[in-house]
UniProtKB/Swiss-Prot annotation:
Species the sequence originates in: Fungal sp. (strain NRRL 50135)
Residue ranges of the region described as Disordered: 1-24
Gene Ontology terms, MF aspect: transmembrane transporter activity
PANTHER family: PERMEASE-RELATED, TRANSPORTER, PUTATIVE (AFU_ORTHOLOGUE AFUA_4G04250)-RELATED
Protein keywords: Cell membrane, Membrane, Transmembrane, Transmembrane helix, Transport
Entry protein name: MFS transporter prlL
Classification of source organism: Eukaryota, Fungi
Composition skew (Basic and acidic residues), residue ranges: 7-20
Amino acid sequence: MAQSFANEHDPAKRAEERGHVGTIEDVESGTKEPYIAEEPISAEAARALIWKQDKRIIPLSAAIYFLCYLDRSNIGNAKILNAATGNDLLTETHMTNYDYTIALMIFFLAYGLFEVPSNVLLKKLHPSRWIAILMFSWGAISMGLAGAHNYATVTVVRFLLGIFEAGLFPGLVYYLTFWYKTEERSIRVAFILASATLAGAFGGAIAYAVGHMNQAHGISAWRWLFIIEGAPSCVSALFVLFFLPDYPETVNWLSDEERELALRRLRVEGSKGLHQSDWWKDAKSTLVEWRLWAHYLIYFGISTPFSSLSLFTPSITAGLGYDGLQAQLMTVPPYAVAYVVQILVSWSADRTNSRGLHSAASATVGACGFLASAVLPAEAYLHRYGCLIVAAAGAFACIPPLLGWLSSNIFSTASVGLAIALNIGLGGAPGQIAGVWIYKADEAKKGYPTGHWVNAGLLFFVAVACVALRLHYGFRNRKTVRETGGIEGVRLFKY
């Protein structure tokens, strides 16, 4: 049935039947694909369809990632929660700061290893089923951390958590390519990723509240934190299974006209949900394309600041003169500001079709925030707190345009899924592993200069690399236009 449905809505097949056949040339491979030469799509009809999709997809996807990020990063809150009374994670599990860092690193090791297989399974099992499985699993595992009493248990559970959380973010970015055109993705990735900044803000507030539950029913507050924040993921998995739409071809809340419109819109720039591609052929071309490795290297540069802020913001604020539960509460403003900036930058990047330069500008702002934090005196608490807010805003705002830029410059369904997973697995995971080492516990009184210097340097690298890759794409496009005599029917690189 699925196959017949796919054939019915296959653009090439319908083009041949109607006799309205044109071709679109792939600037990368030189291959040509048939398409239907139909009337231009009405802007009003497209807006109505996009809004209908948005209501079903974006809030639910953002909520899923909110819970994922909450369960991933709460170990940073647990580390210092009620430390003054000896009821924190490190004390009760007899872990050193080095042990804690290893436990963080193990998570990202699993994260890097399982992202590509997870994206393959997302396509095979359908998004709603696979994401629901991931969600229930990571929620249960996060709750299991509440029962940890030693270093070995914490490390093993964090590895398992990394396995099941690995597939979510690259999966969601891949998932959006089934529904949205390239110029529509960055802002939607931003709304999803921005839920991580909300999770960071709410995580601090929740930890502050849960801290007052210390020893309730004989259970330490950090254990309550894992239970309270893991349970919603398990419960929500059932909701996701039934309400997350898979593909435009399969949903029943689109009319026949809307479904046809959705498929027409994505004929060139979208992934095909029921399309059976030559996966190995696409995979080989993806693996050997050097410009994609440039994207992965850039993503490595942004991943270290992202992970270090995610895991060490409570520790950083604790080193800024805020003690105990107040340190948890002071993690809220940096994430709140980052949320707003992230949305605005991504909206502008999509509106101007200039993702590379927006990422470069955001990275520069973040680098300046970290640089100022590194050179200011350790006792300049208020100024360094302001710099932390600037650094977080710049670092987080850089990511959605980068991911939108990558996905808009890949031209087959299999390649999109693989490249996104490789970007976050080969680029993101090593960067995030590096991020767990740079904020050294013995530098707390000095203001963590090593962490700030490393993040500043990496963000300056990201800015320069984005500009260089943007110039390369411009050169390639001008060359293609000269060789073809015009841009009609030729697929060019996006900026």
